[in-house]
Structures are given as structure tokens and as C-alpha cells.
């Protein structure tokens, strides 16, 4: 299985640079797994494809305003820091620009004295471990001085931070949004519940590795980055009970899929727990839990495109993507959505 098997031509103008005005008015392509049929709808029409007894599983991770700008105390030189992962109470794994000048022991100032940072170590991938200190709670200060770490393909500044958060985001820790969830409004979620569909949340903190392209030609040699996940006993019980009653498990986003498939046993039961997952799902993988997926349109040659190809078939997905290009769907984080059922 070669990397080139997951390539497609995407005109740059189809990469969405900003969210549409109303979350649930984005377009929705329906891809049927068992028949050769696609449909073109509006996201709000998702309701028509859900049945009483189904369970919709969402990732309630919240994006941190993880990009902070500061300066070196010693020289006043400007510096940019991107928070990747919390290691301990005060220490974070980060990426620093310019990295070559970020030496161990260097003291950094952010927000005109609101936060200080000390570089204490290097990381395996060329980053830095920074120990932060501030008078107010760390996350509170971060909200004041940080900006959203938008993906590199989005060039337009974000005017409203909340548009890069899902309406149900609860647990801070992601460096990128679980973007399939951006289409849901509180009103649509209420309509889904009223239809007899359960909504269950799990947690997977999205790392920046989600944007890293696969760089090996032999796909099976690719290694995923680790991400923290958590499934509560209550969430596992609700999902397992729904399956026992014959309900379908439909994941919202590839992060929810990775969380569920990591936490399941061979019988397809979801087990509660937490830890780090580097599960890599590509064609040939046998899904144990999910039967459907709400997802966005992904980058060529990406691990996310491979995951949805594992669910619906590579040829079917690439054919659907060609349709999406022809029909001028909007791609990537702020783009349109696909339902695979």
C-alpha cells in the first residue's frame, strides 16, 4: 500500500479560510458503505440519517489558545512558543521559533510580565520543555495572552476564538480542534436527543501531529504521534448498552474513532480507561466499535484520509472526493462535512 494511493488533486481555492456564518448550514455529503450512492445535503439534514437507539460519540476536548508571543529577558529578542503537551503542573512540551536560539536556562517573558517561562530541556522532536510561572492561574493567563493555533493552510486571521471550538468543548488540552464537531449547534444536538439518539462524550487531546503529512512511501511503515485519551465508565457503559440493543455507534470525528478503537476489546466492547494512543488505522483494519462516521474533508496523503478509506474503501472515498471537488465542497478544518454510514 503506497502513499501515492491516497493522493488527489485539490484546487487551493477549495481550502476553506474561515467558518461559514451558521455552523449547521455547511454542506454534508452522504457516503453509503454498502451501496454505490452518494447524496448531497446540508449538515442540519444529518438528523434524517440517525435512528432512535443510535449513539453519537463526540470528543469534548477544548482547544487551548496555545500560541503565545514573548521575548527573551536577556536580549529582548522576539520569540514564538506553541504549547504541545502538558508534562507536569508547570511544564509543557513546546515548539519554539526561532528554535536555534532557544537555549536551556533562557528566561522568557510573555504578555508584558503576565507570564514567565524558563527553558529546561530539549525534546526528541526538536522542541523545548518550558517551565511556566505566573501570578494568576495558568489557563486564565493563557486565555488573555494566547491565540488559537490555526492549521498552516488557514492564512486568514480568526476573528472569533469560539468558532474554532465545538459548542460542547469542555476539557482543555488540544492543540487543534476536533473539526468534525464544529458543525453542531446546541439546537441541532437537542433535536438529535429528541429523536431518541444518545450523545456520549469521550476525550482525546488533539496534537499538532494531526497536521503532519505521512512521509514514508510504504504506508504501513508510518508511525503516529501519541495523544492522550480518556473514556469514563459511564461513557463506556452507554455505548456498550446501545450496541447490545442494536443501536449503531456513529463517531463524530477521527479522534473519536481512534479513542474508541483504542479502548475496545476483540468482542467490540468499549472499556473505560485513559492513557496515550498511537493507533494508526488504514485500509485492512477491522473496526470493532463504530459503524458510521461524521468527518470533514481531509488533506491528500494524510493519515485521516487513510482512516476513512479503511471504513468506506479507498476507491469509494477517492471517488467521493473527486465529486466533492467537482461540486465545489469546502475542504479541511473550516470546510464541509461527510457522513459515512
From Swiss-Prot:
It comes from the Bacteria. Transmembrane segments: none annotated. Pfam families: Queuosine_synth. Its main location: cytoplasm. NCBIfam families: PRK00147.1, queA. Belongs to the QueA family. This is S-adenosylmethionine:tRNA ribosyltransferase-isomerase. The lineage of its organism: Bacteria, Bacillati, Bacillota, Clostridia, Eubacteriales. The gene is queA.
Amino acid at each position: 500500500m503506497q502513499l501515492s494511493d491516497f493522493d488527489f488533486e485539490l484546487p487551493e481555492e477549495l481550502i476553506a479560510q474561515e467558518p461559514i456564518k451558521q455552523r449547521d448550514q455547511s454542506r454534508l455529503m452522504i457516503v453509503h458503505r454498502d451501496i454505490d450512492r452518494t447524496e448531497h445535503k446540508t449538515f442540519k439534514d444529518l438528523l434524517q440519517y440517525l435512528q432512535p437507539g443510535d449513539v453519537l460519540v463526540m470528543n469534548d476536548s477544548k482547544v487551548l489558545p496555545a500560541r503565545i508571543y514573548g521575548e527573551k529577558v536577556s536580549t529582548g529578542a522576539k520569540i514564538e512558543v506553541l504549547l504541545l503537551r502538558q508534562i507536569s503542573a508547570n511544564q509543557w512540551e513546546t515548539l519554539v521559533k526561532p528554535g536555534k536560539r532557544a537555549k536551556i536556562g533562557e528566561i522568557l517573558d510573555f504578555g508584558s510580565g503576565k507570564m514567565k517561562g524558563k527553558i529546561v530541556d530539549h525534546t526528541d522532536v526538536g522542541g523545548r520543555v518550558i517551565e511556566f510561572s505566573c501570578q494568576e492561574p495558568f489557563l486564565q493567563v493563557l486565555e488573555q495572552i494566547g491565540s488559537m493555533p490555526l492549521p498552516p493552510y488557514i492564512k486568514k486571521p480568526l476573528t472569533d476564538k469560539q468558532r474554532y471550538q465545538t459548542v460542547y468543548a469542555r476539557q482543555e488540552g488540544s492543540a487543534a480542534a476536533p473539526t468534525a464537531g464544529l458543525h453542531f449547534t446546541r439546537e441541532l444536538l437537542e433535536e438529535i436527543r429528541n429523536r431518541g439518539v444518545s450523545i456520549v462524550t469521550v476525550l482525546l487531546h488533539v496534537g499538532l501531529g494531526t497536521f503532519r503529512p505521512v512521509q514514508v512511501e510504504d504506508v504501513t511503515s508510518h508511525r503516529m504521534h501519541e495523544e492522550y485519551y480518556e473514556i469514563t465508565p459511564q461513557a463506556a457503559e452507554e455505548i456498550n448498552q446501545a450496541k447490545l440493543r442494536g443501536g449503531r455507534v456513529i463517531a463524530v470525528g477521527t479522534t473519536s474513532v481512534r479513542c474508541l478503537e483504542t479502548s475496545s476489546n476483540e468482542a467490540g466492547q468499549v472499556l473505560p480507561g485513559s492513557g496515550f494512543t498511537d493507533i494508526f488505522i488504514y485500509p485492512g483494519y477491522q473496526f470493532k466499535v463504530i459503524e458510521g462516521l461524521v468527518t470533514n474533508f481531509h488533506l491528500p496523503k494524510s493519515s485521516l484520509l487513510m482512516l476513512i478509506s479503511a471504513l468506506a474503501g479507498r476507491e469509494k472515498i477517492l471517488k467521493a472526493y473527486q465529486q466533492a471537488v467537482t461540486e465545489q465542497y469546502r475542504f479541511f478544518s473550516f470546510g464541509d462535512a461527510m457522513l459515512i454510514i
